């Protein structure tokens, strides 16, 4: 089967969050038995230099704000084809210092137009799998009735709160027909279109990244027209739980760890926890923390409203009052949050038990996973979440809000701790206190939580099998 994965992120090349990880992991799993090609836009300032040999390169035309030229360069990478599309005559759209900007609907619609033109020139494509609203226009462009043939279209919602509202005039700058454009337009305001809405109507099948989040989406009334769209397509909509690549996230082989360990040590809990402790010592030395503070809780997250930044700040107070260590590693995406957390970071530079790191440093993050006893994920909503899956893999017990994919993967008293209420901090503080107390006073119970998490299947094989089932059902 020829499968194309279209996205604006794919680890390790270009990544801001979990989207890039999922696109890479799913593509790699599918490529074992199928011909998989990943389509990405080229970001001149962000892409690493490629060491892989070029398989193919050709220039082609596409229409967006007039006739434009693009170059598709294909590489072989880990059994997959990676095709990077450079918008030669609109190069400024992606010559940015960050993946996302304020002009994303323009930039990603231009990429979608180029991707559609590229796909239409290929000999045979069975499935085009589109990831999130960024490539929503691609669904409509591949459904145009004048095309001689078109592949089956799968669209995955990675975060329903981001939808791609834009002007209808912008989408009309592509080759999409008036009828196709109507799928994107809002009835209440035809001058406004929504990339997500059109993708829902123009795709053969729609998925999201966990079963619980699928139910959250069906019960979301924040925009009644989007709600009507998803309800009209609910018979071809489901949640498929994300998984992680055990070859990438593996404490037995992770070069960033000071000391490696794995599930084979579950037969010798004292040895396992000694190795976790050695990683903790290495991290404390690196960050200037005092070894007398334990357990170590971490937060590894984008610091945005969805992720519960107010709970992250509350956790600092709880750690101070209860004498345990807390490391927050994350990136802020708005100026006010950046200001608040920078001030906190500066005020805590000499703290013996608290550190805030406001950038993403992959080796450091991996060491944090290996060193931490628990990982806190206080999200207001969470489509799936990958950090709890990675944490469990590294023997780091998840403390989460029971929502979306977190509810699907973390069970209180089985492999982690949970809280529900977000109207105040009482439920959250109770969860933290329960976790710290269990760590300090009930080592046998703590080991059972760690063991359950480390032995949990990564879910990647299951995820790939579910998607293959969807693909096959459409062919």
From Swiss-Prot:
Record flagged with keyword RNA-binding: no
HAMAP family according to UniProt: Glycogen_synth
Function: Synthesizes alpha-1,4-glucan chains using ADP-glucose.
Residues binding ADP-alpha-D-glucose: 15
InterPro entries cross-referenced by the UniProt entry: Glyco_trans_1 (IPR001296), GS/SS (IPR011835), Starch_synth_cat_dom (IPR013534)
Name this polypeptide is given: Glycogen synthase
Stated family: Belongs to the glycosyltransferase 1 family. Bacterial/plant glycogen synthase subfamily.
Involved pathway(s): Glycan biosynthesis; glycogen biosynthesis
Molecular function (Gene Ontology), one example: alpha-1,4-glucan glucosyltransferase (ADP-glucose donor) activity
EC number assigned by the record: 2.4.1.21
Pfam family, one: Glycos_transf_1
Source species taxonomy: Bacteria, Pseudomonadati, Chlamydiota, Chlamydiia, Chlamydiales
Reaction(s) this enzyme catalyzes, per UniProt: [(1->4)-alpha-D-glucosyl](n) + ADP-alpha-D-glucose = [(1->4)-alpha-D-glucosyl](n+1) + ADP + H(+)
Key words, A-Z: Glycogen biosynthesis, Glycosyltransferase, Transferase
BP GO annotations: glycogen biosynthetic process
Uppermost EC category: transferase
